[in-house]
Amino acid sequence: MALNIEEIIASVKEATVLELNDLVKAIEEEFGVTAAAPVAVAAAGGAAAEEKTDFDLVLAGAGDQKIKVIKVVREITGLGLKEAKELVDNTPKPLKEGIAKEEAEELKAKLEEVGASVEVK
């Protein structure tokens, strides 16, 4: 049974960040492509490096207060209890990708407040 475009878009809208990440990986493997954007070669003189604007929030460890960390992870990602627990149990894992620096720092502080170790990349 074939899905129409609207059904596919609706499914993508309802998916979590982790589910979308898995989808991208599956598409890359199935079709032998990569989701990475092509990189432009810099001129010999070299332009000034652009300041990074998109950051990834990575949960490196849960610490001693795992239940509190799971609650904050659920709040940040919108995941269900089971998915959030699996994410916390299998660190390091990305929580949010391509977010602004301010949001990344705010979420990092919130997670560190409950004892998690977090990296902003």
Curated annotation (Swiss-Prot):
Any Pfam family matching the protein: Ribosomal_L12
GO biological process: translation
Cellular component GO terms, alphabetical: cytosolic large ribosomal subunit
Molecular function GO labels: mRNA binding; structural constituent of ribosome
Family assignment from sequence similarity: Belongs to the bacterial ribosomal protein bL12 family.
Subunit structure: Homodimer. Part of the ribosomal stalk of the 50S ribosomal subunit. Forms a multimeric L10(L12)X complex, where L10 forms an elongated spine to which 2 to 4 L12 dimers bind in a sequential fashion. Binds GTP-bound translation factors.
Protein name: Large ribosomal subunit protein bL12
Organism for this UniProt entry: Bacillus pumilus (strain SAFR-032)
